A protein has these predicted regions:
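N-terminal Rossmann NAD(P)H-binding glycine-rich loop of SDR-like oxidoreductase domains
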Residues: 7-29
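Rossmann-fold scaffold of SDR-type NAD(P)-dependent oxidoreductases
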Residues: 12, 79-88, 129
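Conserved glycine-rich Rossmann-like NAD(P)H-binding loop of the short-chain dehydrogenase/reductase
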Residues: 30-43
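Conserved residues in the N-terminal Rossmann fold of short-chain dehydrogenase/reductase
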Residues: 38, 65-66, 106, 198, ...
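Conserved Rossmann-fold cofactor-binding substructure of NAD(P)-dependent oxidoreductases
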Residues: 63-84
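Hydrophobic/aromatic anchor residues within beta-strands of the central parallel beta-sheet
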Residues: 64, 104, 165-168
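Conserved Rossmann-fold NAD(P)-dependent oxidoreductase catalytic core, especially the SDR/UDP-sugar
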Residues: 87, 91-151, 156
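Strand-loop microenvironment adjacent to phosphate/nucleotide-handling motifs in alpha/beta enzyme folds
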Residues: 151, 155-172, 177-345
Length: 345
């Protein structure tokens, strides 16, 4: 964490699961200050009390700013003196965005542009924008707006060399706020069947710690305009559900309710076109931005016509985890171990 020594980090949407994971991982380092920017004063107050209780010696490093990425003035107010930004603020619930697509546009697209414009004006050194696998071949409003968020970031990156701007794409972050596992655990506790959409549906899976690792990797190794992804494994929804049931109550019934608005049978982290230019970096892929300008005439003679033919990287052709492998992964997640310790079978 030497790159963060004495630095000020701003996290938009900072009271969410990602922000909590960053605070847990960064507060005990030599970072100077972490600013939490979000709309919900109650969540900020809860977070303040939580970290004062569990990390009293370093909790003063956290500074809270109430605001909305839709309001550029509130964004600028939080950004004075900031070195780095992790931009996590978003509307991310797929069905909700289907019913309120313009709200998703205002937060995910226009809000991102506000953050980037203010960051460039304030001389911020690096901005990492958190995106999603739903931005690749998007079929729903949330994915479409996150795809546009990436385009906004890449367009901004083309026009600045003082602020490095990168995007990271995630699959499903296990046990994050609003995700399915906390719902299933509550259903099991209540003695009800757990509800799944479609058993054969596949999803990439990663932990919150892996989500933070991806952002830090992008921060350290990404270049301006890059999209970075982790080579994440995947599993079927049925496999994930069986793993949760076996951990908490193997007698729990699994009830299929059908696909919700805007959902896909599988997700894609890199498209065919992106795979053709992707750089293999071990556990990660880096997709460099297309740095060409709009004057295509000069590329008729000078352009590179050779492209490697590759298939997309999606949740059907990555490693598919078994029930036992998913259980092992779940048992590394504090949310699960805490829930199990409080569980009375």
């Amino acid at each position: 964490m030497s790159l963060f020594k004495g630095k000020t980090l701003l996290i938009t949407g900072g009271t969410g699961s990602f922000g909590n994971a960053v605070l847990n991982g960064f507060l005990n380092t030599d970072i100077g200050e972490i600013r939490v920017f979000s709309r919900d004063e109650k969540k900020q107050d809860d977070m303040r009390h939580e970290f004062q209780a569990k990390m009293p010696d370093v909790a003063d490093k956290i500074k809270f700013f109430i605001g909305d990425v839709r309001d550029i003035d509130s964004v600028r107010n939080a950004m004075h003196g900031v070195d780095y930004i992790f931009h996590a603020a978003a509307l991310k619930q797929v069905p909700s965005c289907e019913f309120f697509p313009m709200e998703a546009v205002r937060t995910n697209v226009m809000g991102t542009d506000n953050v980037l414009a203010a960051a460039i004006d304030e001389g911020v050194k690096c901005v990492i924008c958190l995106s999603t696998d739903k931005a690749a071949y998007p079929v729903n409003a949330m994915g479409i707006t996150k795809a546009l968020e990436e385009r906004v970031a890449i367009a901004r990156a083309r026009n600045t060399d003082k602020t490095k701007i990168c995007c990271t794409r995630y699959g499903n972050v296990l046990c994050s706020r609003g995700s399915v596992i906390p719902l299933w655990i509550e259903q099991i506790k209540a003695g009800n069947p757990i509800t799944i959409t479609e058993p054969s549906m596949t999803r990439f899976v990663m932990s919150l710690e892996e989500a933070v690792d991806l952002v830090v990797f992008a921060f350290e190794h990404g270049e301006n305009g890059d999209i970075l992804v982790q080579k994440a494994p995947a599993c079927t929804i049925e496999t994930l559900a069986k793993a949760v049931c076996e951990l908490f109550n193997p007698e729990t019934e699994i009830k299929v309710i059908g696909i919700r608005h805007g959902e896909k049978m599988y997700e894609t982290l890199l498209t065919n076109e992106e795979c053709a230019s992707a750089v293999d970096m071990g556990d990660f892929y880096r997709v460099p931005a297309d740095k060409r300008g709009l004057n295509y005439d000069k590329y008729f003679n000078d352009g590179n016509t050779e492209r490697t033919a590759l298939s997309e990287f999606d949740s059907t052709n990555t490693e598919l985890m078994t029930v036992e492998q998913v259980k092992e992964k779940l048992l590394t997640i504090p949310y699960i171990t805490e829930a199990l310790s409080n569980w009375e079978k």
